Amino acid sequence: MDSITTAASVVAAGLAVGLGAIGPGIGQGTAAGGAVEGIARQPEAEGKIRGTLLLSFAFMESLTIYGLVVALVLLFANPFAG
């Protein structure tokens, strides 16, 4: 693998993880804030809100994991390497 491809792969891997974590991070913060407000308004609905929140966290976190998988593929199984 030549040096340009290696450098581009490392930069792309960093961008994949970094940019792949921004959206889910913002979404998780917004969802957690909404859950806290919902529990404050209706404490008896805490169980339902918490269950829905954890499920939505799992879906949001999967986007970050996809970014990590793309980064690992670029670093260790690079399809662009000759």
UniProtKB/Swiss-Prot annotation:
Q: Site Reversibly protonated during proton transport: which residues?
A: 61
Gene3D superfamilies of this UniProt entry?
F1F0 ATP synthase subunit C
Transmembrane regions: 7-27, 57-77
Q: How does it sit in the membrane?
A: Multi-pass membrane protein
The UniProt entry, under InterPro entries, shows:
ATP_synth_csu_bac/chlpt, ATP_synth_F0_csu, ATP_synth_F0_csu_DDCD_BS, ATP_synth_F0_csu_sf, ATPase_proteolipid_c-like_dom, F/V-ATP_Csub_sf
**Entries under PROSITE patterns matching the protein:** ATPASE_C
Q: Name one GO cellular component term.
A: plasma membrane-derived thylakoid membrane
What does the UniProt keyword field contain? ATP synthesis, CF(0), Hydrogen ion transport, Ion transport, Lipid-binding, Membrane, Thylakoid, Transmembrane, Transmembrane helix, Transport
Please list the GO terms describing molecular function: lipid binding; proton-transporting ATP synthase activity, rotational mechanism
Q: What does this protein do?
A: F(1)F(0) ATP synthase produces ATP from ADP in the presence of a proton or sodium gradient. F-type ATPases consist of two structural domains, F(1) containing the extramembraneous catalytic core and F(0) containing the membrane proton channel, linked together by a central stalk and a peripheral stalk. During catalysis, ATP synthesis in the catalytic domain of F(1) is coupled via a rotary mechanism of the central stalk subunits to proton translocation.
Tell me the subunit arrangement: F-type ATPases have 2 components, F(1) - the catalytic core - and F(0) - the membrane proton channel. F(1) has five subunits: alpha(3), beta(3), gamma(1), delta(1), epsilon(1). F(0) has four main subunits: a(1), b(1), b'(1) and c(10-14). The alpha and beta chains form an alternating ring which encloses part of the gamma chain. F(1) is attached to F(0) by a central stalk formed by the gamma and epsilon chains, while a peripheral stalk is formed by the delta, b and b' chains.
Instruction: State the protein's name.
Output: ATP synthase subunit c
The species this protein was found in: Prochlorococcus marinus (strain MIT 9313)
